[in-house]
Amino acid sequence: MSIEAIFDNDVGSIVAPAGCGKTQLITDTLVIKPNKPYLVLTHTTAGVAALKLRLKKLSVPTKNFFVTTIDGWALKLAKNFPASCPVLTSPENPRAFYPELRRSVLELLQNGNLNDILRASYSRLLVDEYQDCNFLQHQVVTELSSLIPTTVFGDPMQCIFNFAGRMPDWNSEVQARFPLIHELTVPWRWNNAGSHGLGLWVLDCRNILSQGNKIDLSTCPGYVHHKPLVGVVNTDLQSQQTTQYDIFNRAQNESLLVIGDSINARSRHKYAQSSRNIDVVEPVQLDSVANAARSFDGAQGIDLVDAILTYSGEMMTNVQRSQTLQRLRTIQAGRNRTPITSLESALFNVIQDSSRNNILAALQQLESKHGAKVYRKAAFAALKDTISLSSSMPDQTILDAASSIREQLRLRGDRRIPQRAIGSTLLLKGLECDHSLILNADNMNAQNLYVALSRAAKSVTVFSQSNFVGV
């Protein structure tokens, strides 16, 4: 379709199956010089980062657009108008905070006080991944669409953020407000990679799964590879990692996304911990960083060192918490027979002076320790950024700094999405790669399976007990 169809409709929707040119259509739209910036909203920081990267490659002037998450934009609005848009709940209680934020922003939009400001600020609103909007977010976008021209892009078969309250019905509520402009049907992701057959297969899977049927993984030889699970954890893990290394060896300079358990984040962390060159894609909430900050705020001396080692040990290998604590106690008692290392010196400084600068120095020494591998790079970088920021704001807590870092990432998008990484369908949706490795497709519903199958442009490897999948 041409972008003229977007500009010809003040409100409308485009149904966009995965890999069918939606992102290109959005970027082509943003290339057209506006008289005021475009507002582009999506759901994940990874999606924000991916879109910004595409726009940067196309040299689209940043003055043409403002890209962020829906909640990131809502938070920015609430902070700019705190008296008119009060949010009393702490962001550290996200289950209460974000619904309150959305309700408060919705009320602010409904009272009409910002109508002139919003019309003067943006020329058009584009909302990506619209199938993941809950009803409050849908109401917010609906209010905005009465002020500025609005196009929403989505695919009901990719609706996997449906666990946080009521979702608008796509036919009776979404398309009632945003009539269908066009449905994309050309599998550009795979055509551009020379994998036309895989693209047609993924589109066919979408139709089969949408009708409630299972798909047969043996029907796309050469592109889709089925690997059996035997139900023995260590045996299956060894098989999965052997397959991963085989992909690395045959595609040394190409990207790989490993799609793990959507519920059990620890299982994804353990996979990355025991694998070479696999990083972890983190949720935007960054709970582990907030928990570390909270722990650091409440500790001093050897207890603070213990907290530093504990949380670092959840993000990197070879921390050796118990051994290190015992060694520090030996040093503290003056019984050490071997010289103090630079890491031990940094940790001992924390015992003597629990300053934030000393905490940061200790984290940096842990990172450079021989044999250490940071397998959660985004989380560890955010933790260091948190401590660094907290050093410049001594009147506030480390947890306050963690909240600031998290909202910065939410607003601008996480730019540190690695080329070879593990995540869940929730975290990886909107991303694309050369190859994908699905660790267990047996318990995936139709939507999660379709999202998982449609990430890779060149090959898909699926572990499951049977070659027929799709609950």
Task: Please provide the spans of the model-predicted regions.
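The feature marks helicase ATPase cores and/or their adjacent C-terminal helical subdomains
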Residues: 1-471
